[in-house]
């Protein structure tokens, strides 16, 4: 069945449409060639293209706006003035302590005070003008000092930890040294106690020689003990309490050990 479609447009309307099709939009430029065979593409300046790609008017409107994150002038002046006050505070406190603040000022003192006020004013202007620069420098300096303090604290903590380990290792390795030196000291007392009798028997000359020999023996024995403990730790230790306790424990285990047959006579059956 054929669909007979008759156009209701007049010839004048068709001529107007042809004219509008051939006219060039001055704002959009000439229309590019449109390939009707490609179904995925749409003709330019179509309504669908305008919906998908709206004009970027929002970006253009905000392109000329610049964000100003700088501090207001009043805050800059306040911070700069506060820094100058803090810088001058020690001098004012010193003059107050000496009771010489605005007292007995002569021409030279007032001239110096005026010059100092001029320097402070110039410093205030300089700090206000270069506010971002010096505040950034102060922040970097504070952060660097904090890092230095942190590194120093970590280093000291590691040093203390290493010293603690060294002392612990030393005490563990040389725990027998006090016992050995106490034995040598006891030997020195036992041998050196009769020095007065030696002097009385052999005279001052031989008694002095015996006394010196006593001290030399003590030093030599101490050095030998130290060398022996260095070469082989525990070789000179005489820990009688531990040794006696260990032997007593062994004897108790030997005498109190009961065979399993006597403890469990039922096991034989």
UniProtKB/Swiss-Prot annotation:
<comment type="similarity">
    <text>Belongs to the WTF family.</text>
</comment>
<protein>
    <recommendedName>
        <fullName>Meiotic drive suppressor wtf5</fullName>
    </recommendedName>
</protein>
<dbReference type="GO" id="GO:0110134">
    <property type="term" value="P:meiotic drive"/>
</dbReference>
<keyword id="KW-0926">Vacuole</keyword>
<feature type="region of interest" description="Disordered">
    <location>
        <begin position="1"/>
        <end position="67"/>
    </location>
</feature>
<keyword id="KW-0472">Membrane</keyword>
<keyword id="KW-1133">Transmembrane helix</keyword>
<dbReference type="GO" id="GO:0005774">
    <property type="term" value="C:vacuolar membrane"/>
</dbReference>
<feature type="compositionally biased region" description="Basic and acidic residues">
    <location>
        <begin position="19"/>
        <end position="30"/>
    </location>
</feature>
<keyword id="KW-0812">Transmembrane</keyword>
<dbReference type="InterPro" id="IPR004982">
    <property type="entry name" value="WTF"/>
</dbReference>
<feature type="transmembrane region" description="Helical">
    <location>
        <begin position="140"/>
        <end position="160"/>
    </location>
</feature>
<comment type="subunit">
    <text>Homomer. Interacts with other proteins that exhibit high sequence similarity.</text>
</comment>
<comment type="function">
    <text>Acts as a suppressor component of the dual wtf meiotic drive system, and can suppress but not confer meiotic drive by compatible poisons. Wtf meiotic drive systems promote unequal transmission of alleles from the parental zygote to progeny spores by encoding a poison and an antidote from the same locus; the poison is trans-acting and forms toxic aggregates in all spores within an ascus, wherease the antidote is spore-specific and targets aggregates for degradation by the vacuole.</text>
</comment>
<feature type="transmembrane region" description="Helical">
    <location>
        <begin position="73"/>
        <end position="93"/>
    </location>
</feature>
<feature type="transmembrane region" description="Helical">
    <location>
        <begin position="110"/>
        <end position="130"/>
    </location>
</feature>
<feature type="transmembrane region" description="Helical">
    <location>
        <begin position="216"/>
        <end position="236"/>
    </location>
</feature>
<dbReference type="Pfam" id="PF03303">
    <property type="entry name" value="WTF"/>
</dbReference>
<feature type="transmembrane region" description="Helical">
    <location>
        <begin position="174"/>
        <end position="194"/>
    </location>
</feature>
